[in-house]
C-alpha cells in the first residue's frame, strides 16, 4: 500500500523529472499533477515545499551527488536517478522531521518504481555514503 507521503514524493519526483527532462516549470507541472492526483492540504503543502526547495538548491544537491557518486557524472545519470538523489539528499540534509533511514528507504522505493534495474541499489549506495558522512561529521562535532 502506498503511504500518503510516498504518493506525495512520487508527485514531487514526477515534477522534478519533467522539469529536468523537458524544461517545464515545476510549479505548473505540480498543478497539473495535483489535478490528476488530488492530495490532502497537508500533502499539497509538503509537495510544493519539497519541490521548490529541491529546485532552488539543485546546484548544491548536484555537488553532493558529485561528491558521493564521483564515478558517475551527474549529467550522465538517468533523469530518474538524478532526481531521486536530489530529493533524498535534500530530505536527509534539510528535513529534520524525516529520519535518515526513512528518507533512504523512500528513495529506494521510488527508484524501484520508476528507475532502471540497478537504480535501487545505486541510490541506496549513494545515500548510505551521504548518511555515513553526515554521521561522521556529527561525531566530529561532538568530540
From Swiss-Prot:
GO terms for cellular component: cytosol. It comes from the Bacteria. GO terms for molecular function: RNA binding. Keywords: RNA-binding, Transcription, Transcription antitermination, Transcription regulation. Belongs to the NusB family. Involved in transcription antitermination. Required for transcription of ribosomal RNA (rRNA) genes. Binds specifically to the boxA antiterminator sequence of the ribosomal RNA (rrn) operons. This is Transcription antitermination protein NusB. It comes from Dehalococcoides mccartyi (strain ATCC BAA-2100 / JCM 16839 / KCTC 5957 / BAV1). The gene is nusB.
Amino acid at each position: 500500500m502506498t503511504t500518503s507521503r510516498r504518493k506525495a514524493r512520487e508527485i514531487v519526483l514526477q515534477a522534478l523529472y519533467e522539469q529536468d527532462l523537458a524544461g517545464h516549470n515545476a510549479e505548473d507541472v505540480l498543478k497539473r499533477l495535483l489535478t490528476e492526483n488530488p492530495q490532502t492540504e497537508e500533502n499539497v503543502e509538503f509537495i510544493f515545499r519539497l519541490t521548490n526547495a529541491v529546485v532552488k538548491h539543485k546546484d548544491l544537491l548536484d555537488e553532493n551527488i558529485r561528491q558521493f557518486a564521483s564515478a558517475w557524472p551527474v549529467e550522465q545519470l538517468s533523469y530518474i536517478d538524478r532526481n531521486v538523489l536530489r530529493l533524498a539528499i535534500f530530505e536527509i540534509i534539510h528535513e529534520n522531521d524525516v529520519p535518515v533511514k526513512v528518507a533512504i528507504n523512500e528513495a529506494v522505493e521510488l527508484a524501484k518504481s520508476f528507475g532502471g534495474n540497478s537504480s535501487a541499489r545505486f541510490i541506496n549506495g549513494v545515500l548510505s555514503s551521504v548518511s555515513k558522512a553526515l554521521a561522521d561529521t556529527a561525531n566530529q562535532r561532538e568530540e
